[in-house]
């Protein structure tokens, strides 16, 4: 573990902060580059600002709600975040922004979510170095010691997740290069589907004492997420949901408001 990466003129530079910064930069770079490649006209920085802001706040808010006894203002810069909160609030902010500006939601979300999970893969390394999300005690050679917990070798659960995400993203990238997965929204569904499975399995390796019916909050959320994806696929297959209908409903509501005034 290395929560303090290095010191610069007496200032301690935290691993979590450095890798969070690298994660954000990598995500932004990928998203902007691919939006430009697709020639999508959008205010990149305005879109990313609101998405990242709500994502960051969401991850902290959910952490405070789930672990109120561990609240400390230091969580806003040194760890203490629930990724689901960030993903959920960030996606909601992105969808609302794209809907407001009448931009192709599925197409842009495919790029944004791919970029987001590049960031998560990098961010997990920072969490590992900070000693967060530590695994159960193990006798295997892969065990690592977490000094702030104890000196028993434990599963490097955060590294497991990071490696699984890297493999998933590289695989999808190679498939995309062959001009496959062209259906808007398909990449997002694949990433979320696999990520739910990765998190569900990985949590069995984590030493998480907050369990409900034998499952962690993350695992319960994963099951819920998989259910939502299945329902969404069924809706889309039977034509109950489409972006054009989504935008038409918005225009109709706006028109009604103007008619009332």
Predicted regions and their residues:
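Hydrophobic, membrane-interfacing alpha helices
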Residues: 1-261
């Amino acid at each position: 573990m290395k929560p303090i990466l290095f010191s610069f003129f007496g200032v301690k530079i935290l691993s979590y902060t450095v890798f969070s910064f690298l994660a954000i930069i990598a995500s932004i770079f990928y998203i902007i580059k691919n939006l430009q490649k697709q020639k999508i006209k959008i205010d990149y920085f305005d879109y990313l600002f609101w998405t990242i802001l709500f994502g960051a706040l969401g991850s902290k808010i959910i952490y405070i709600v789930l672990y109120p006894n561990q609240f400390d203002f230091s969580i806003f810069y040194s760890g203490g975040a629930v990724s689901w909160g960030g993903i959920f609030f960030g996606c909601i902010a992105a969808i609302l922004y794209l809907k407001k500006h009448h931009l192709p939601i599925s197409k842009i979300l495919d790029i944004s979510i791919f970029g987001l999970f590049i960031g998560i893969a990098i961010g997990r390394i920072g969490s590992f170095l900070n000693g967060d999300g530590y695994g159960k005690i193990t006798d295997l050679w892969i065990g690592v010691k977490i000094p702030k917990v104890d000196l028993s070798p434990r599963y490097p659960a955060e590294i497991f997740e990071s490696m699984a995400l890297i493999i998933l993203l590289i695989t999808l990238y190679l498939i995309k290069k062959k001009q496959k997965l062209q259906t808007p929204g398909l990449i997002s569904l694949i990433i979320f589907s696999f990520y739910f499975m990765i998190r569900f399995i990985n949590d069995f390796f984590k030493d998480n004492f907050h369990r409900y019916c034998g499952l962690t909050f993350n695992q319960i959320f994963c099951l819920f997420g998989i259910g939502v994806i299945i329902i969404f696929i069924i809706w889309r297959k039977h034509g109950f949901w489409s972006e054009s209908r989504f935008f038409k409903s918005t225009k109709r509501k706006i028109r009604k408001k103007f008619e009332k005034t």
